[in-house]
Amino acid sequence: MLDFGSGAGLPGIPLAMAKPDLAMVLLDSNSKKTRFLQQMVIELPLPNCLVVHARVEKYDEVFDQIVSRAFSFLADIATKTAHLLTADGEILAMKAQLNDDELHQDLGAFEIATVQKLNVPYLDADRHLVTLKKR
């Protein structure tokens, strides 16, 4: 699984902790963030995590699942990660605000498979999990 634009490691670090059998790649283009992630992987320890400092456009591994949180519009996520996803893979995008305009954007080779509203304890704001699949 790839957590791209990992930032502080969300959701990649909690997923790796909850599923130690899951190989997780934490990808970010910001070296300060990847140094922080590397230290977390060492300290926790999380042997199932690999931290990669690279731009998503330049990275070339292939994954069955890609997760993203607070990155950008769905169309941008689909465009930037299309080359990293297997033919039957899926992108799991965590979104806060989700409006009709974004849901009807051209997603290129992708389509929206599901939109699930999430309930976050102690948070009175909308959150969604959008699953994208290749057409």
Where are these regions (language model features)?
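Conserved SAM/SAH cofactor-binding pocket of Class I
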Residues: 1-68, 78-79
